[in-house]
Every structure is written in C-alpha cells, then in structure tokens.
Amino acid sequence: MFFLETERLQLIPLTHDLLTLCQQDRAAMEAKLGLNKSDMRIDPLYMTELEDALTHFWIPMTAAHPDRYLWYTNWEIVLKEERLAIGGIGFIGYPDENGQTETGFMLDKNFHSKGYAKEALTGITNWAFSHVEVSTIIAKTTTDNLPSRTLLERVGFLPAGQEADLLIYNKQRV
C-alpha cells in the first residue's frame, strides 16, 4: 500500500474500497489499515462536511478516476508510533490545465498545536510538487480561522484573494 511518511506521521491515501468501508464502519476501516481505533473530536460543522465529501466527492471521484485516486481521496493523517488516525488531508482533484490543485485538511482537536498539521501539509505539498504537472496549490479557509491561516503561512502559502467569507491562499512550485 502506498503512503507518505514524515518524521512522526504516515499519510495514507484511502482507496475507493477503503472509503466505502469507512462510510459503513470507520472502526473496521481503521482495523483494516492496522490502526488503533480513533475517537476524534471534530467540530460538528466539519463532521457534516466530511460526511458530505465522503458521499458526494471521495467515493464517486475515486470510482471515476481509479488511476488518479490519490488526487481525489482523503489521506488519513496517522501517528506512526501510536498507529492512530488524527485527521485527514487531501486534494480536490488532479491539477487543471494551469497546473493548479486545491488542498484541504482537518485535525482532531486533541492534536492541535503540536505541529502535526504543519508536518502533514508540508509532506503532502512536497509530494504534489514532485509531480511536474503541479505548479500551484491553493487552500481556502474562513476569515475567522486564524490557526488555519497561520498554518498556511508557516508552510509557505501566501494570501491570494477572497471568495465570499473564504480567504484564498496559494503556494507556487519553487
């Protein structure tokens, strides 16, 4: 199974079958990956977004693009030593004709302010930029989400505009 590894984390992209299993029984999906059962503390708004993404994006898009599923799936953020999922990260699709893709991430509240999100975002952006077809990665966050904004800037994303109540950041290939 393909995964990315950083100092403390594994980033595991979920296949279509694993996403389907996750929708049915997250604990069974974690067990299949050899992970300990997680008990994530996630903001209810993000839970709704995750359920919507699973049903209306990740599952159908990984089925439609099996050869490029890495660009359309959730990557579990896993603590290597503890074998524990603490969040998710990924892209909203294969880079467009301008070489642009978008990333998003979520981390269990129990693991905020420990550098895990920075490590995961750095790892996945480095992986994306290793593909010649990627020139720009964008990320969007709400104007009031200061921790996310700070994280994006620490990883090298720069403010690039605003769309309604969302701030847009981008990072260019160096």
Feature names for model-found ranges:
Residues M1-E102, L107-N110, G123-W127, H131, ...:
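GNAT-family acyltransferases
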Residues K118, D144-P159:
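Conserved active-site alpha-helix within GNAT-family acetyltransferase domains
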Residues T136-T141:
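Conserved hydrophobic beta-strand within the GNAT/NAT acetyltransferase core sheet
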